[in-house]
C-alpha cells in the first residue's frame, strides 16, 4: 500500500497564485498578510520580485472564479488561494455571492486539475470577520497551510 500526503515543511518548490477580493479590504488585507506570512515562513519567496508567487486583486468575491480561471491559463500554478470576505447584510445578496463564488471556484479547480483553496470568510458581522482575520486567529495562515499541503500533494501524485 502506498500512502500519499502533502508536506508542510517546504513551500519553496511551489508556484502559488493568490486572488484577493478588494471588497471588505480591511479584512482581506489582513487575511492576505497572514497568508503571506505563513508562505514565507515555509520557504516561499514572497518578495516583490518573486517568480513563485503572483497576486491578483479583483473587485469582490463574486469575481474570484473568473480571475482564478484566467490566472491558471497564464502559468502552471501548483495551487491557487482565493481570498475574500462576505459579511451578511439585510438582503439576500450575501447568499448569492457566497453560492456563486464557491460553485465557481470549485468548477475552476476541477476543470484545471489545480487545487484552489476557498479562503472566503462568510460571517454575520464585521466583528466576526475581524476576529477571524486578527492577530490571535488569522485564517489567512490556515489557508496558506492548506495550499502548501494540497500543492505538494498534487505534485506528488502527478
Curated annotation (Swiss-Prot):
Name of the coding gene: ribH
Superkingdom in the source lineage: Bacteria
GO cellular component terms listed in the entry, alphabetical order: cytosol; riboflavin synthase complex
Binding positions (5-amino-6-(D-ribitylamino)uracil): 23, 61-63, 85-87, 118
Active-site positions on this chain: 93
Annotated organism of origin: Prochlorococcus marinus subsp. pastoris (strain CCMP1986 / NIES-2087 / MED4)
BP terms from Gene Ontology: riboflavin biosynthetic process
Residues noted as binding (2S)-2-hydroxy-3-oxobutyl phosphate in the record, renumbered to the chain: 90-91, 132
InterPro entries per record: LS, LS/RS, LS/RS_sf
Listed transmembrane segments: none
Keyword set includes Transferase: yes
EC number(s) recorded for this UniProt protein: 2.5.1.78
Its biological purpose: Catalyzes the formation of 6,7-dimethyl-8-ribityllumazine by condensation of 5-amino-6-(D-ribitylamino)uracil with 3,4-dihydroxy-2-butanone 4-phosphate. This is the penultimate step in the biosynthesis of riboflavin.
Annotated metabolic or biological route of this protein: Cofactor biosynthesis; riboflavin biosynthesis; riboflavin from 2-hydroxy-3-oxobutyl phosphate and 5-amino-6-(D-ribitylamino)uracil: step 1/2
Catalyzed reactions per annotation: (2S)-2-hydroxy-3-oxobutyl phosphate + 5-amino-6-(D-ribitylamino)uracil = 6,7-dimethyl-8-(1-D-ribityl)lumazine + phosphate + 2 H2O + H(+)
One Gene Ontology term of the molecular function aspect: 6,7-dimethyl-8-ribityllumazine synthase activity
Protein family per UniProt: Belongs to the DMRL synthase family.
Entry-linked SUPFAM superfamilies: Lumazine synthase
PANTHER family (UniProt xref): 6,7-DIMETHYL-8-RIBITYLLUMAZINE SYNTHASE, 6,7-DIMETHYL-8-RIBITYLLUMAZINE SYNTHASE DMRL SYNTHASE LUMAZINE SYNTHASE
Record protein name field: 6,7-dimethyl-8-ribityllumazine synthase
Keyword terms: Riboflavin biosynthesis, Transferase
Amino acid at each position: 500500500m502506498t500512502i500519499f500526503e502533502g508536506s508542510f515543511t517546504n513551500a519553496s518548490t511551489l508556484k502559488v497564485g493568490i486572488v484577493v477580493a478588494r471588497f471588505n479590504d480591511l479584512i482581506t488585507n489582513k487575511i492576505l498578510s497572514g497568508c503571506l506570512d505563513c508562505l514565507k515562513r515555509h520557504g516561499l519567496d514572497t518578495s516583490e520580485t518573486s517568480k513563485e508567487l503572483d497576486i491578483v486583486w479583483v473587485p469582490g468575491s463574486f469575481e474570484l472564479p473568473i480571475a482564478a480561471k484566467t490566472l491558471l491559463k497564464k502559468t502552471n500554478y501548483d495551487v491557487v488561494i482565493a481570498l475574500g470576505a462576505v459579511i451578511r447584510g439585510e438582503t439576500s445578496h450575501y447568499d448569492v455571492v457566497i453560492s456563486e463564488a464557491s460553485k465557481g471556484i470549485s468548477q475552476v479547480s476541477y476543470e484545471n486539475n489545480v487545487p484552489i483553496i476557498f479562503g472566503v470568510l462568510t460571517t454575520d458581522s464585521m466583528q466576526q470577520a475581524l476576529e477571524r482575520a486578527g492577530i490571535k486567529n488569522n485564517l489567512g495562515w490556515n489557508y496558506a497551510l492548506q495550499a502548501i499541503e494540497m500543492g505538494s500533494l498534487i505534485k506528488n501524485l502527478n
